[in-house]
Amino acid sequence: KGLRPISQDVLSVWDDLVYHEYGMPTSQEECDALGVTCQGGNSVVLRNHGLLTVGATIPGALRRMYMLERACEVEVIARGMNEEPDPIDPDVIRQYGERARQQRANPEYGMTYWKAALRQIEGKGTDW
């Protein structure tokens, strides 16, 4: 169960994707367990709860969240179809993972998404 490598969106987080069996966030044990999970990847599916992304920068975490949400949308649509999606070649998955790691290593990673989000907020007249 979980996301399958069936779209470019999921490939952008595939090598950075982890799953966490969600518990009550009010306990120190759950917080510690989530911290351990995040050591395995910055794009986290909290089973039966939602999504969490972390990273070195807020813009980077925002971009991960955007791509992870899109990957989930594609997965839900694909599961609603009566046939399996065509698989993505394992070499393409590997190459895309290498490219995604290079992009995430750039200090400007996610900045375009961050600036776009700020423009949307400011366009609505929202005051900080």
Residue ranges and their predicted role:
Residues 1-128:
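Glycine-rich flexible loops
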